[in-house]
Design a protein with these regions (language model features):
Chain A
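Q-loop/switch helix immediately C-terminal to the Walker
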Residues: 72, 79-98
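Hydrophobic anchor residue at the start of the ABC signature
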Residues: 126
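ABC ATPase NBD coupling module
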Residues: 60-74
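Conserved ABC ATPase signature
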Residues: 112-116, 120
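Catalytic Walker B motif of ABC-type/P-loop ATPase nucleotide-binding domains
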Residues: 137-141
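H-loop/switch region of ABC-family ATPase nucleotide-binding domains
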Residues: 172-174
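Helix-to-loop junction immediately C-terminal to a conserved catalytic motif
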Residues: 45
Length: 201, 265
């Protein structure tokens, strides 16, 4: 599996961002709201015009079609959108183990998306993304709508999976506690730059 | 043709009905009187002018003048398409897309119908070419503007859905497929409805006009069927071309959704 590299990315207020994320490594990003965390993820996912480039292993962002890049480097937005009627239609393949690990059941696939709570949407958006077998993940506060217990449950499922599949992960997170649990490295956005913060004291 | 001659004073009589209606709405404080009168005056003036133009055109009958007339009609309908958009593409793209798709569909269907079906001599005889083109352009314009309006509106409203689908690695065409389908449906619904209701609920305007002008109903019906089919084809192809091109233009070469290319009309 390949690592994810950001080279001289410039988007919004952010300038000249360099970052290497190794396979299986989680790099946490934090910063005040409006500092450009989401836009940085969107730039890496190539969803908006930006300076610089990103690389997954030997493949450069601009060298393949947009959808091919995003088929490898998948972003999970803070607020997920749903377009089919049922949950199952959004999954590329049945994900019984993932659903069970997150406190759902086989029946969940037949649930109507209009009745999902924000917490359910957030967890199912992650399952939906992983059902398409990405090779790198960009997560925008994936536990923002979850309580403490559910958050821990999600981490217990996701972390081993990231390690097993050796996915490079950029994870936008808020809480210092969570960052200490997850991160290989942690960067705080300060103005136009990323400032590395110690993860464990 | 044995049309009963209609004199101008008889039209004045008909116009008094509109004036009476305007007076009623004025006294009922509906605030419609003024625009009703302006619209009625526009109808009279515009149609009188086009009557003069058509008389002259029919008298000359040369291909140049027919073509010039056709192009003028096309450009005006292109402007009309843009005027009906809530959001339009920046940089004249809406006008270009609307005009080109109407040109491709309405003009080719008109020429095809003239050459292969009606077969007048010469084939561009303005007596057939201009009314047919006018009817096709009018209807294609409605289809194109409804289709484009629906597409751009859903791109803005459903931006989250489209972008989330892109994030999951879908192509731009897949990510907006539902909205393209909706836009096509919106553009084609009027003609599908009027084909389905023709003769049962409504007597189409052209057929009514022909019968009033003295044509035998059987002939009027045949022409109406012809016109309905050509309108359906023209509207369908025109809307398809416009919606497909506009959808492509909503995404850039990296398949990103670019709602910043839209501006409030």
């Amino acid at each position: 599996m390949a690592g994810l590299t950001l080279e001289r990315i410039a988007v919004g207020a952010l300038k000249d961002i360099h970052l290497d994320v190794a396979p299986g490594e989680i790099v946490c990003l934090s910063g005040p709201s409006g500092s450009g965390k989401s836009r940085l993820l969107r730039a890496v996912s190539d969803l908006e015009p930006h300076g610089g480039t990103a690389r997954l292993g030997g493949v450069e962002q601009g060298a393949v079609a947009g959808h091919r890049w995003r088929r490898s480097v998948m972003m999970v937005p803070a607020e997920s959108a749903w377009w089919f009627d049922s949950v199952g239609e959004h999954l590329h393949k049945p994900m019984p183990e993932a659903l069970e690990a997150l406190g759902f059941s086989d029946e969940t696939a037949s649930w109507s998306v209009s009745r999902l709570s924000s917490g359910e949407k957030q967890r199912l958006a992650l399952v939906r993304t992983l059902s398409r077998e990405p090779r790198a993940l960009l997560l925008d506060e994936p536990t923002a709508n979850l309580d403490e217990t559910t958050t821990r449950r999600l981490e217990d499922w996701l972390l081993p999976l990231i390690r097993k599949r050796r996915l490079p992960v950029l994870w936008v997170a808020h809480g210092g506690e969570q960052i200490r649990r997850l991160a290989g490295r942690h960067f705080r956005i300060e103005g136009a730059r990323l400032v590395e913060e110690p993860v464990r004291t | 043709m044995n049309a009963i001659e209609l004199s101008w004073w008889q039209l004045v009589l008909a116009s008094s009905l509109v004036v009476a209606l305007a007076a009623c709405t004025h006294f009922a404080r509906l605030g419609l009187g003024r625009s009703l009168l302006v619209a009625a005056a526009r109808t009279a003036i515009q149609l009188a002018l086009i009557g003069l133009v058509l008389e002259a055109l029919f008298a000359v009958g040369s291909l140049h003048w027919v073509a010039l007339m056709g192009i003028a009609m096309l450009l005006l309908s292109g402007r009309e398409v843009v005027a009906r958009q809530k959001y339009r593409l920046r940089g004249g793209w809406s006008f270009a897309i609307g005009t080109v798709s109407m040109f491709i569909s309405a003009f080719s269907v008109t020429v095809l119908t003239l050459l292969a079906v009606i077969d007048p001599h010469p084939w561009y005889d303005p007596r057939y070419a201009i009314p047919l083109l006018g009817m096709l352009l009018g209807n294609t314009m409605t289809g194109v503007s409804l289709g484009l309006d629906r597409l751009t509106e859903s791109a803005r409203r459903s931006r989250d859905i489209i972008e989330n689908r892109l994030m999951l690695g879908e192509t731009w065409a897949d990510a907006c497929s539902d909205f393209r389908r909706e836009a096509m449906r919106a553009g084609l619904m009027p003609i599908i409805n009027s084909m389905a209701a023709a003769g049962i609920v409504s007597l189409p305007g052209m057929m009514t006009g022909q019968i009033l002008a003295g044509s035998p109903p059987a002939l009027a019906v045949k022409y109406q069927i012809l016109v309905m089919f050509t309108i359906a084809a023209g509207t369908g192809f025109g809307t398809f071309a416009a919606v497909a091109t506009c959808a492509r233009r909503l995404f850039d070469d990296r398949e990103r959704l670019r709602v910043d290319r839209l501006t409030a009309g």
